[in-house]
Amino acid sequence: MLTRKQIELLEFIHKRLQRDGVPPSFDEMKDALDLRSKSGIHRLITALEERGFIRRLAHKARAIEIVKLPEALMGSMQGGFAPQVIDGDRLDPPVGAMPVSGIHAVELPVMGKIAAGTPIEAISEVSHTVAVPGQMMRQDAEHYALEVKGDSMINAGINNGDIVVIRETSVAESGDIVVALVDGHEATLKTLRKRGNAIALEAANPAYETRVYPAEMVRVQGKLVGLIRSY
């Protein structure tokens, strides 16, 4: 059974598809449901997807397929229902925008901040979304983004405030820059080095020491595949 907010969001998306042929933005969804942050929209969309009402298409910006509607909505919809895919790439570009051939953007959730310094408490709450070139990502994997906090990776070209694009994986090789979860609750962005039965998390700044942990204390959460910087 869907919650009232889930039904409201599904109805809003469906009506926008029928009217405009393009999906509402996350900001529009947030305003329509009178929510204070877009993280609430992400949770609702995830719940609808898990229950089989919508499907998000990988590597297409804001592409949503409505699979079915609940009975509570079917009676109020005229003309029947047919699943359809709404491709966010069809939105009109801003005035003055220049077309870039062969590039399309994927909207990724920014799952909070990651420490490039001393490990901080792991954050898994969506703070906002960011448009990422689809070429950064593999089609057979999930991805997310994090905002960098700290300067321990500056010699690897990663600065405080950068957005890093992470491919979800639990496997990494020595020398990979990874998101590592230490002791189950502290997350950090570091270069991973395997040392026998231990794992070293190495900074790219001489001001920070390399930290070494028993292998069972470190869990790889993902591997760095790209970086976005605002000037």
Swiss-Prot record:
It catalyses: Hydrolysis of Ala-|-Gly bond in repressor LexA. GO terms for molecular function: DNA binding; serine-type endopeptidase activity. Its EC number is 3.4.21.88. Pfam families: LexA_DNA_bind, Peptidase_S24. Residues 26-46 bind DNA. Keywords: Autocatalytic cleavage, DNA damage, DNA repair, DNA replication, DNA-binding, Hydrolase, Repressor, SOS response, Transcription, Transcription regulation. The keyword Ribosomal protein does not apply. The record marks A116, G117 as: Cleavage. The active site is at S152, K190. Belongs to the peptidase S24 family. PANTHER family: LEXA REPRESSOR, LEXA REPRESSOR-RELATED. This is LexA repressor. The gene is lexA.
